[in-house]
Amino acid sequence: MTTQGKFKKQLTLTDLTFIGLGAIFGSGWLFAASHVSSIAGPAGIYSWLIGGLAVLLLGIVYCELGAAPPRAGGIIRYPVFSHGELMGYLLGFITLIAFSSLISIEIVAARQYAAAWFPFLSQPGSGNPTLIGWLVQLLLLCFFFALNYYSVKTFAKSNNLISVIKFVVPLLVIVVLFSFFKPENLHSQGFAPFGSAGVEAAISAGGIIFAYLGLTPIISVASEVQNPQRTIPVALILSVVLSTIIYVLLQVAFLGSIPSEMLSGGWAGISQQFSLPYRDIAITLGMGWLAFLVVSDAIISPSGTGNIYMNATPRVVYGWARAGTFFKIFTRVDGESGIPRPALWLTFALSIFWTLPFPSWEKLIGVVSAALVLSYAIAPVTAAGLRRNAPDLPRPFFVRGFCVLGPVSFIISALIVYWSGWNTVSWLLGLQILMFVVYILFKNKVPTHAVSLKQQIWSSLWLIAFYALIIIASYLGSFGGINAIGHPWDTLTVAVIALAIYYWGAYTCLPQANFAGDEEE
């Protein structure tokens, strides 16, 4: 029998830090190094630093939000507090797509690497699964569903163990590859052979921002954290700083250990020569044992990240339902375990669905990256809005210098979305505008008891304008568009648009914060 219960505060700082690090270290680090090298050359090191800075700035903003009302599914509910239910609806839709498909991506990545040992898991000459391969994916999803079904502490213990195991290999890779380090590689063909455009493009197209996106699971479990006002900020900052250090060292180690003769044709072909960067470089250098460990870790790392998002996504669904713009059944929390089980069942079903039409890792990576950044990007405007309409809200973690950090972090988020390219931006942001229209068409079904529909629309117009202007800029720009606005003027244009939209969004928040029906879980 399922009774309505409450979330249980069982997660410690260690648990939360490992959730953050574990979510960040999935399949991204295993693919990105060679892609970044092909797009930016050695200057890809700067791409990793810029990506880390962007996520750190957003993480600091999330510290203020996550500590000052810690709520399950906070990524959805904070915009509802500041700008109304329509904002929660738009964020809920895009975040559910991103999180649920990310579970599938990681499980698919684990299966693709496992095919190096068990070829019958993948179709010959393809990353697509055989029937047996798909059933293996399904079994993994069932296993992670079971881990998350009974207790959040069961999930945390399993995640801590997986995280420790999967970090040993990247650290070992760094140490071993540095023993082959050749400094002259960093100047082969010039340090930045593709200029600043290459550095920018690598952040999105190279998989860097995908590799970093692991903060929202920390926010999603905020109601289950012991001493959240201290634990959430420390765990967020630790996760980003540690991951940035490891990623930069991995990239430098990869760049410096490539045999010099393989660079004679330039950097552009490196991703073809090293499609699985660290496995392939280990084989090239004659270290079969390291290649074996990399493949082993390549199975464990994505699986661990998939487990984390199997835990985080139900909290997002719960937050969306609590906002009043999704089915009420998903607000139910099991009384004994403290798990939002209806939301977990939906997550499980969606994660299976995403393995059907999009069977390979490469086909979803760009879309999921942009979708996740969109869910992150709203945080600075939400925090600015709550400072205006809820100035007395207790803020145990108060971000100083927010007048600079807020707009800068929003601008960087907008640029990352723009750098994803026209093919991704056009349909993803277009779909969000369509969802806005659907909300208006079903005006008799939407919640208006706390905030009128007129006010919800007024407080959300800035986001729709943001989507529309980024679509136009992407079409006219140099990242997959018609190049009517060349680089770097297109990037500068998007930055100016984002700055204007930030202040529009901050100043059109609700007159009073919308905490109607919100009580601590």
Question: For the regions a protein language model found, what residue spans apply to each?
Answer:
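TM-loop-TM module centered on a large, flexible mid-protein loop between adjacent transmembrane helices
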Residues: R77-V80, G84, A115-Q123, F194, ...
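Terminal cytosolic tails of multi-pass membrane transporters
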Residues: M1-Q10, A383-L405, S426-E521
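Helix-loop-helix junctions that connect adjacent transmembrane segments
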Residues: T2-F7, P42-I45, I50, L121-I132, ...
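Loop-to-transmembrane helix boundary motifs in multi-pass membrane proteins
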Residues: K8, L13, L131-L138, Q226-Q229, ...
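Membrane-interface loop-to-helix entry segments
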Residues: I132-P183, G195, L236-V240, V368-A377, ...
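Extracellular loop-to-transmembrane helix junctions
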Residues: K8, F31-V136, L242, L249, ...
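Membrane-helix boundary/coupling elements in multi-pass transport proteins
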Residues: R71, I94-A109, Y212, T216-V225, ...
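Membrane-interface "cap" regions at the ends of multi-pass membrane proteins
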Residues: M1-S34, S38-A43, L49, L56-C63, ...
